[in-house]
From Swiss-Prot:
Keywords: Cell inner membrane, Cell membrane, Ion channel, Ion transport, Membrane, Transmembrane, Transmembrane helix, Transport
Membrane topology field: Multi-pass membrane protein
PANTHER family hit by this protein: LARGE-CONDUCTANCE MECHANOSENSITIVE CHANNEL (PTHR30266:SF2), MECHANOSENSITIVE CHANNEL MSCL (PTHR30266)
GO cellular component, as recorded: plasma membrane
SUPFAM superfamilies, sorted: Gated mechanosensitive channel (SSF81330)
Cited InterPro entries: Mechanosensitive_channel_CS (IPR019823), MS_channel (IPR001185), MSC/AndL (IPR037673), MscL_channel (IPR036019)
Annotated protein name in UniProt: Large-conductance mechanosensitive channel
Compartmental location: Cell inner membrane
Species of provenance: Aeromonas salmonicida (strain A449)
Primary role: Channel that opens in response to stretch forces in the membrane lipid bilayer. May participate in the regulation of osmotic pressure changes within the cell.
Claim: Protease is one of the keywords in the record: no
Similarity annotation: Belongs to the MscL family.
GO molecular function: mechanosensitive monoatomic ion channel activity
Amino acid sequence: MSLIQEFKAFAARGNVIDMAVGIIIGAAFGKIVSSFVGDVIMPPIGLILGGVDFSDLAVTLKAAEGATPAVVIAYGKFIQTIIDFLIISFAIFMGLKAINTLKKKQEEAAAPAGPTKDQELLSEIRDLLKSQQGK
């Protein structure tokens, strides 16, 4: 099998395609959450804390000189990134919790209520054979 054929077989598998779709949706979801945090959550928090813009919070280690930009530790952006992470993690947790709940309900519904007709018939045959051996 050639390398191209092997790659086609690999790429055609359903789980690879599902993974690609998940990555694309995850990237889009990450952008939505980043916008939500930066544009919706952080401005009111900054207002409550006295008009602070978190994206501008930084410690300057070395001031800008000519064309050389300043060396800063942008801890405000880091705080926003942490909040992004917490929201995304919580959303993933809630999604997985919902999926696990659905799976559990399906497993409970799929559990057989009792022996099937085949099992009952086999039990009767077994009992008859035992009674014939005992005579």
